[in-house]
Amino acid sequence: MILTALSSAIALLVPIIILGAAWVLASRSTEDREKSSPFECGFDPKSTARIPFSTRFFLLAIIFIVFDIEIVLLMPLPTILHTSDVFTTVTTSVLFLMILLIGLIHEWKEGSLDWSS
């Protein structure tokens, strides 16, 4: 009982201490306009240092990563079919594919896969 209470207290205190230390170390003094502006050989910059980024491209990249991970998770299925219960493996894989298909249909209807607009 005492060991559980002690481990719970440690589990609560360690993240609080780490967050507190990060907050103290990350706090900055008053921001100076010159310090926060980009530096270009001592002169004012000719253009902005921030390049605009298309959020549609970012969303499409995230969708690609999700479906790429799907393929990685489906690759061992032929090997698993030989070593385990076929019904359980097929049921699990069909459920997995149905969830991903529902996600794909949702993305399609939402227009996230339409690059032209």
From Swiss-Prot:
Q: What is its main location?
A: mitochondrion
Q: Where in the cell is it found?
A: Mitochondrion membrane
Name the reaction it catalyses: a ubiquinone + NADH + 5 H(+)(in) = a ubiquinol + NAD(+) + 4 H(+)(out)
What GO terms are given for molecular function? NADH dehydrogenase (ubiquinone) activity
Its Enzyme Commission number(s) read 7.1.1.2
Print the keywords alphabetically: Electron transport, Membrane, Mitochondrion, NAD, Respiratory chain, Translocase, Transmembrane, Transmembrane helix, Transport, Ubiquinone
**Membrane spanning segments where?**
5-25, 57-77, 86-106
Query: What's its job?
Result: Core subunit of the mitochondrial membrane respiratory chain NADH dehydrogenase (Complex I) that is believed to belong to the minimal assembly required for catalysis. Complex I functions in the transfer of electrons from NADH to the respiratory chain. The immediate electron acceptor for the enzyme is believed to be ubiquinone.
- Protein name as annotated: NADH-ubiquinone oxidoreductase chain 3
